[in-house]
């Protein structure tokens, strides 16, 4: 960017034309399969409770809100889309903006394009197959490999993530020169994520996409716990060429259980000195009314386009990243 006037887009126009073609191809993919495109709000009075996500806040001062109403930019369209599912929408997808007040860099921008879709009556494996179909169509790549979270740790770190004690996880961290972080970290899931990021991610999905599934139940988020093994959740992630592309679940349909998870998130936030975020009670009401058994996935479109174009960074495929927005 140092050689380019700051008003100009960071991405070449040729790349933006290719990006538009990919967006059209994604829409054709879902149209051919009878999946309805929907649009949901980018602002809400409630937000995520996940301790790892930081939402943007804004204030509405219009009619009925003279004192100001706090609104949150959506980190994902998930909550509103589930309300549509509970209302009987059938299979749905959305291509839209999401916002996270976190990183900016090679693979991150605080404003980004998300593809999210939900399939009633699909289990996790059937949705994984559909994600694989989409990736093969857009990226012209080979069919993905699949590994359970446990298998990935055993293969690359020689440790069982479902049974290892924190002391054992720290021993592995020491071999990866991560003791300066791991020795003071008390949260087991944070230790696992550290080991996964450094010891597993760089070695999967090199030549074809890799699906990692059955994450620990403690990392279930909005996913169902497996009925076959209560130690794991019906959750998967997709990696390709060192990039995390997607995160999917067999969706939790129990409103009471979801509320308990949100409340536990907020307790964990309080322990870390983070603000306790407002829980989306409209989502809870929708779940209690009846969310159909379904699976859903969120996929980063900017990263997908980056891979399709063999680009080096997101700024090569989005017109105006945050530094010149």
From Swiss-Prot:
Q: Does the keyword Cell cycle apply?
A: no
Single GO MF annotation: lysine-tRNA ligase activity
Q: Where does ATP bind?
A: 100-102, 109, 244-245, 300
| Enzyme class, broadest EC rank | ligase
What EC numbers are recorded for this enzyme? 6.3.2.-
Give the reactions, separated by semicolons, that this protein catalyses: D-beta-lysine + L-lysyl-[protein] + ATP = N(6)-((3R)-3,6-diaminohexanoyl)-L-lysyl-[protein] + AMP + diphosphate + H(+)
Binding, substrate: 76-78, 118, 251
Q: Which UniProt keywords apply?
A: ATP-binding, Ligase, Nucleotide-binding
Q: Which family does it belong to?
A: Belongs to the class-II aminoacyl-tRNA synthetase family. EpmA subfamily.
Q: How does it assemble?
A: Homodimer.
- Name used for this protein in its record: Elongation factor P--(R)-beta-lysine ligase
Which species is this UniProt entry from? Yersinia pestis
């Amino acid at each position: 960017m140092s050689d380019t006037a700051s008003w100009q887009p960071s991405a070449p126009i040729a790349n933006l034309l290719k990006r538009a073609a990919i967006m059209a191809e994604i829409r054709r993919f879902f149209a051919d399969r009878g999946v309805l495109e929907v649009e949901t709000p980018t602002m809400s009075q409630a937000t995520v409770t996940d301790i790892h996500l930081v939402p943007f806040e804004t204030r509405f001062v219009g009619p009925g809100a003279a004192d100001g109403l706090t609104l949150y930019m959506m980190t994902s369209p998930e909550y509103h889309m589930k309300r549509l599912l509970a209302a009987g929408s059938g299979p749905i997808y959305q291509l839209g903006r999401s916002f996270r007040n976190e990183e900016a860099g090679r693979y991150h921008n605080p404003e980004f394009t998300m593809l999210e879709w939900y399939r009633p009556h699909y289990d996790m494996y059937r949705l994984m197959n559909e994600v694989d179909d989409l990736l093969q169509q857009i990226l012209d790549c080979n069919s993905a490999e699949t590994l359970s979270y446990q298998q990935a740790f055993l293969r690359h770190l020689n440790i069982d993530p479902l049974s290892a004690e924190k002391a054992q996880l720290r021993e592995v961290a020491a071999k990866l020169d991560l003791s300066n972080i791991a020795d003071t970290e008390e949260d087991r899931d944070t230790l696992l994520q550290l080991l996964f990021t450094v010891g597993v991610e760089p070695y999967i999905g090199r030549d074809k996409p890799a699906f990692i599934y059955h994450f620990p139940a403690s990392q279930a988020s909005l996913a169902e716990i497996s009925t076959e093994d209560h130690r794991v959740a019906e959750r998967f992630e997709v990696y390709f060429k060192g990039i995390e592309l997607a995160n999917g679940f067999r969706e939790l349909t129990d409103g009471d259980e979801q509320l308990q998870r949100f409340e536990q998130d907020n307790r964990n936030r309080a322990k870390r000195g983070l603000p306790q975020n407002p829980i989306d009670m409209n989502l809870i009401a929708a779940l209690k009314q009846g969310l159909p058994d379904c699976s859903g996935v969120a996929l980063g479109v900017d990263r997908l386009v980056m891979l399709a174009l063999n680009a080096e960074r997101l700024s090569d495929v989005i017109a105006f990243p945050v530094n010149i927005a």
